[in-house]
Amino acid sequence: MKWLCSVGVAVSLAMQPALAENLFGNHPLTPEARDAFVTDLLKKMTVDEKIGQLRLISVGPDNPKEAIREMIKDGQVGAIFNTVTRQDIRQMQDQVMALSRLKIPLFFAYDVVHGQRTVFPISLGLASSFNLDAVRTVGRVSAYEAADDGLNMTWAPMVDVSRDPRWGRASEGFGEDTYLTSIMGETMVKAMQGKSPADRYSVMTSVKHFAAYGAVEGGKEYNTVDMSSQRLFNDYMPPYKAGLDAGSGAVMVALNSLNGTPATSDSWLLKDVLRDEWGFKGITVSDHGAIKELIKHGTAADPEDAVRVALKAGVDMSMADEYYSKYLPGLIKSGKVTMAELDDATRHVLNVKYDMGLFNDPYSHLGPKESDPVDTNAESRLHRKEAREVARESVVLLKNRLETLPLKKSGTIAVVGPLADSQRDVMGSWSAAGVANQSVTVLAGIQNAVGDGAKILYAKGANITNDKGIVDFLNLYEEAVKIDPRSPQAMIDEAVQAAKQADVVVAVVGESQGMAHEASSRTNITIPQSQRDLITALKATGKPLVLVLMNGRPLALVKEDQQADAILETWFAGTEGGNAIADVLFGDYNPSGKLPISFPRSVGQIPVYYSHLNTGRPYNPEKPNKYTSRYFDEANGPLYPFGYGLSYTTFTVSDVTLSSPTMQRDGKVTASVEVTNTGKREGATVIQMYLQDVTASMSRPVKQLKGFEKITLKPGERKTVSFPIDIEALKFWNQQMKYDAEPGKFNVFIGVDSARVKQGSFELL
């Protein structure tokens, strides 16, 4: 039996040798061995012990660690989240091993979305890299650091397709596109779980939020979703399935209702689709407090009814409430919930614990007690090099008039803006165990880059916002946004004075961390007025103006696009954000990021996304017609389209060549272009391939991303980029909900973004 690193564990196991030998050992991590083990264990468990396995407790004011330890002793807890130090986790696992009857280990989970202690760019930023190697880096480092803290599971990746930037949680996902979100999520699952979630430095993933949470009406958090089956399965479901096909061991159930039924009580979603059609074998976990919310949804009469509905629908674990532990015993006794249903849920929980290797070693992610870090936040535990490399790839160059960028590391540079020196905000939302004072701000990054070669003048210039209502909201639980005691005009005057003395102005503007988060939906997606006033004043100085955007959603930037000489979209870039942004500003790194989500011109354009349907009256800007699908007071397309991003060099793409004008159902067609770097710098770009089903049994999108490749070329260098197309790329869910490809013409578009493309076509026979 593997040595368990705790005196308490050794004593408790010695007291019950037969049980210990049966429960812990070198168990093969195979489905067959797992099923036999769990079946045997279930026979030994009481009803209360089974129910205890279904309870997922959040450490916090309502559940302090001391109280949780008592619950653990009584077998009332199956898993813990929101504790992230080895010492705390070890103490809780010790309680299980020393005091509970069956000694079934706990698992420990946390929201490790874009890093654990080293914070990487938010998921929108990571998606902007269009680089799966970058995703793998983030996944492996995040898993390493999470496991090194003793964690077994992460509530990630978030693969909700989002086409509404009003939604605050758009920052957590990979953007508007089904294909990109699917492949990013799949890659993240594989990277985090490694060969096995039981490995020392791997963690189990939990794909979320199932399902269609990114389509909430009005972009309003926790709102309802109503859509056709075709749209659901063509656009929103594939990323979840991709993550599960990649091996994710868990699914977090969404808070929203879908077509009138809350996901938490939707047996069609959680059983018919997830279990029966997709063959999912892992656990389903409710979102925070979602089971009790069934009463407010109006699909449960009282707490007991909510528990009955949720468990029967297929929710295995109840997060952050006591409903299962309080009401399941009575429901079992009355027969309203069967023992078979309870056993199914308990089996799923025990299965993932087995897959995590916890029945081989409950301390597998803790290591010896002597190895616990003296300083949990020690600098040596960070992965700064990897964070900087990924952050550079996440930066998108939106504008560069007259080659304003890259900047010179000489002269005088004014760095202004409320986000220029904010260590907290550069990390973004869901920054896990990241520590703000370890992050590098844009101001610090610029200072590091220029050294003594240039003079840096800094002025805050404005508050994030002067709207008291918004400030009060952002500061509801803590002082997240600090308001400068000076008047707005005094702050602008200081910034203008700095600008007048400078050769160039770098203004760092956008959103605070809390403005792009859960429960942070916005009806106005412009930069706050306080910062817009600052930008206008800086523009009036006549000095070259570079905007560095820090935000977690697309912003409406029509005016700023007119005012700025250069614009960098940096999202929330993480621990090394400031250094990475400075690398791009000064040309030490040539930007190659591309937008994973369209930027609307105004909130009135929402939703604006590239893969829309053509309609019967499509707008043609070359042949204006009043009676077409358009706005009369705004341009039809987005300000910046999906896939868009500039470089310090230029690229040309040749016409599309196809290996054949026709394709058999069991064959392939290869589409190719030749890409040339026509500029003076080495640079990378993302070549994107889109398909259009021209005529089908139902209207199909004008184009859909089906492949991409990031390439690096030296000046004058050429490269042929090829994309194989098979039948899977052509399939869709039709009106009869049959997943198939239909014969006919298909257009192929290849280019550097979704708008600038070259076209070819072939026929599926």
Curated annotation (Swiss-Prot):
Write out the GO biological process terms. Answer: glucan catabolic process
The catalytic activity, as recorded, is: Hydrolysis of terminal, non-reducing beta-D-glucosyl residues with release of beta-D-glucose
Q: Does the keyword Hydrolase apply?
A: yes
- GO CC field: periplasmic space
Active site, per annotation: D287
- EC number, as in UniProt: 3.2.1.21
Q: Which family does it belong to?
A: Belongs to the glycosyl hydrolase 3 family.
Q: What is this protein called?
A: Periplasmic beta-glucosidase
- Whose protein is this, by species? Salmonella typhimurium (strain LT2 / SGSC1412 / ATCC 700720)
Gene that produces this protein = bglX
